Amino acid sequence: MPALPPVYTPSGAPSSVHAPPAVPPVPVPTQPLRSEYQTSNDACIKRLEELNIAPAAKLYPTPTEPGKCGVEAEIQTNVFGIEMHQDSLFYQYSVNITTELKNGKEVTFTKKGKDDFVVTERHDKCCAILFRALGDYEEFFKTSDSCLIYDGQSILFSNVDLFQGFREGAVKTKYMQLDGGEMDHKDLKSLPCIKLEVFPTKNPAVKFTREAVARRATDSNLDSVSLAYQQILELALTQPCLRNTARYVVFDHGKMFFIDPLGEGFEKCDVVDVGDGKQVVPGLKKTINFIEGPYGRGRSNPSVVIDGMKVAFHKNQPILDKLKEITTQPVEHGLKGLEKDRCAAVIKGLDCYSTYGGRERHHKIEGIHHEGARNARFELNDGGSCTVAQYFEDVYNITLRYPDTNLIVSKERGNINFYPMELLKISSHQRVQIPQLTSAQSQKTTKESAVLPDVRQRLILTGKNAAQISSDNEVLGKMGVSVCEDPLMVKGRSIPAVKLANAEIGANPINVKDNKWRANRFTRPATAPNVWAMYVVGTASTRITLDTLKKFADEFAAMCKSKGVNMPAPADISLIHMDAIESRLYDATKANCTFVFIITDDSITTLHQRYKMIEKDTKMIVQDMKLSKALSVINAGKRLTLENVINKTNVKLGGSNYVFVDAKKQLDSHLIIGVGISAPPAGTKYAMENKGVLNPNVIGYAYNAQHNQEFSGDFVLNSASQDTLAPIEDIVMHSLNEYQKFHDGGLPRRVIVYRTGTSEGNHGSIMAYEIPLARAAMRDFSPDIQLVYIVVSKDHSFRFFKPDLASLASRPQATSSTASRHSAMPAAPKAWDLNIAPGILVDSIVTNPACKQFFLNSHITLQGTAKTPLYTVLADDAKVSMTALEDITYKLCHLHQIVGLPTSLPTPLYVANEYAKRGRNLWNEAVALNNVPTVSGPEADRLKELTKSICYKASGDLTGRRVNA
């Protein structure tokens, strides 16, 4: 018997046969729910049809001249120009590779996969088969004369018509057979007949010329844009790596990694063991972008953007060794309870393999069984039963060294199988997924991956050379294409610092130094609550006295008063056990309490979202702080920590801490709306199938209806299957209603929307289906309101560096404050020393020539390398100049209110993202409490009803204040 038979509990099985472990936390239903929408834009399309509105053209607004504000600044990029030296014509073909196993089952190698191991294994085999065929069938492929570009799966491009000479009307399909025994790939040796099929696609031949690339790759009408140029160039750059799977691992979206990083020129510090059987290794992400180039507006030039990265992979090691790195408990004696569950979470979903049956067999890990091979039993074909350990002794002559170690659970062809852990190894080339990370692991991995700019530049250049993105690439040579050796230098601009004050006209200016500031008195102190309370929430082991809490309360109230909030003494101040805090909060509500300040023991991580649910339900503001932070205020005198806490208090209570100087009244008659999205975590799609709805997207939004520079908002639920946002109509309508409420019925002259949560590939759909719904909402108020619609993205590969980075990285900084008096050493440069400063702007050369676009780095980078947001204008009724658009966007990045630093995103968008997160947490809390109503009807109506059950709109005045500060 080649593999361990299924171990399960059939009808009539003896009680000693154990069932598999508990099902996953979010099971797929027997007949799974499906979204009623067939495409990712159906909700918007359906609503447009109801309104009798035609979709808009997928047409970018006309680009305008670059902005003029600021002083010129030299910026180093990670963009490498691509030069085309000859014209070509490329034909596209489909590739299908199959074989038949001994049991008669057909295997398709070119079938797409999702898991890392499946993807890389199929790439490996497909490449081995196709490149063998290039030699065996040289006459058909015209191998010596043609330039062949393969994607490692089912797409092949050739600059020669492979079917030239076939008679008219003939079936243009080439069937080939290959013997796996003649190939070098060990997994193919046992396959005597591998079938390869090549046939033309319906796509026309691609005219690969400079003129065609410039015209078809970057047309402002997206329906005229051909993605084939981008695809061909991307695959051409990847060919050396795809063809040499012993050196490279290639994934989708331009990501690649190196089997032997040190042998490819990387340094030892680039490969870091982060524990739990995981290792951070260097890699690249490359994307083809068509940019304006150095010769001004109206030009289009191909380029490759290369970003270095460090990503955690699971080590190729025995599972037993991996678990020994995860837990301190003796794995050989068996894991139980929470420790077993913790280890299972780290390895769930991984591919592993065994060799005890005489050949390599792969298994996908579902979990860890609660028993080991010594005790776990299963039925034999003769009706008897035996232990797993005895079975391996009898059938494979294997005496297990660790029979008490938990069995590994694997699901194969619908059966649940159990395997001895000591006989399994983790397969190579598997990236660590978020659910496989503990909190501590996540922090450590993030720290190792967040490299400083000088290190990132080294990773980029080392990786570029190792991946042969250069003249060494034989395929590029055949195409007549070359990649520039050096990255582009561009002329950006540095925008002047934003002036902050206690009033928009500039009264009581705030001192801004190095893009940092501290406000004294608040611009608009909140009205202090008449009745409020302060509690410490802890356990029996929490160490804080009531006197210490009272001291903190005194300092809290005193600083509030110094900033203009006349906080009375708390009506109730107590130490509360975590089990009693919910009832105490509801009691506080009954006593007319409107604000509760809670200090929670750091070890308690389950209550914060419960506080927020109670806050929404009772309209009583609840602010939460970690105990360690509070003690640092009392014991270490950390006044800045307390100041930031009180900044948050003032905003939560409806106040404003500071504003930027707006003497020209740029925001007058402007409604600014931010729209952010929280997508459901992986694996939670069916969290609420019993309620008639799939786990939704949560769309947060924020607007400045009440005061020009203050943003509050709410959230709505939307189908997770939709890339465009049908609720944008309701969002714009609600925001305009709120604006009218605080402007005596008046309407704004202009609505500016900052929208995130999308990629460049969705721009056309947003312009065609989403923006018309926003306009429809505006027309219900007035046809004269202008719309400016901007999408903001950090999901790109562009990086910007200081031009003198090498000298800065080697230059000692000011002496570290932690150094002793006698051994003071210059401190190493920090992230903020090496990264580009706030206010750096790039709106030419590396931008898309078809649209109005700019990069704006508005924040101080505290860790790693700056990720500069990209702003793309999708609607511009006002024809706003780039100067004005960039200026107001930068100013809006200075209204965070809590800490005295600019943010990476404009405040309306930052706050909208926070509302999306809050909405997700409230949704999860409602699901956990089974507090979600069962709904029926069309999906859009169901989601609206569910939104009403958890959003802030139903909580009265909470939408008028930024409760998620």
Curated annotation (Swiss-Prot):
Domain Piwi: 594-924
Tissue: Expressed in the hermaphrodite germline and in oocytes. Expressed at a low level in the male germline. Not expressed in the soma of hermaphrodites or males.
Coiled-coil annotated residue ranges, if any: none
Region entry Disordered, spans: 1-34
Compositionally biased intervals (Low complexity): 10-20
Subcellular location: Cytoplasm, Perinuclear region; Cytoplasmic granule; Cytoplasm
Coarse class of the protein's main subcellular location: cytoplasm
Molecular function (Gene Ontology), one example: single-stranded RNA binding
GO BP: regulation of gene silencing by regulatory ncRNA; regulatory ncRNA-mediated heterochromatin formation; regulatory ncRNA-mediated post-transcriptional gene silencing
Domain called PAZ: residue spans: 318-428
Pfam hit, one: Piwi
UniProt keyword RNA-binding, yes or no: yes
Entry superkingdom: Eukaryota
Quaternary data: Interacts with znfx-1; the interaction promotes the transmission of epigenetic information across generations. May interact with mina-1.
Entry similarity comment: Belongs to the argonaute family. WAGO subfamily.
Function noted in UniProt: Argonaute protein which is involved in the endogenous small interfering RNA (endo-siRNA) pathway and is required for RNA-mediated gene silencing (RNAi) in the germline. Interacts with secondary 22G-RNAs, which are RNA-dependent RNA polymerase-derived endo-siRNAs, typically 22 nucleotides in length with a 5'guanosine residue. Also interacts with the mRNA targets of 22G-RNAs. Associates with znfx-1 to mediate small RNA-directed transgenerational epigenetic inheritance of both germline- and soma-expressed genes.
UniProt xrefs under PANTHER family: EUKARYOTIC TRANSLATION INITIATION FACTOR 2C
Other facts noted in the record for this chain: Members of the WAGO (worm-specific argonaute) subfamily lack conserved metal-binding residues found in other argonaute proteins and probably do not cleave target mRNAs directly.
Protein name (record): Argonaute protein wago-4
Organism: Caenorhabditis elegans
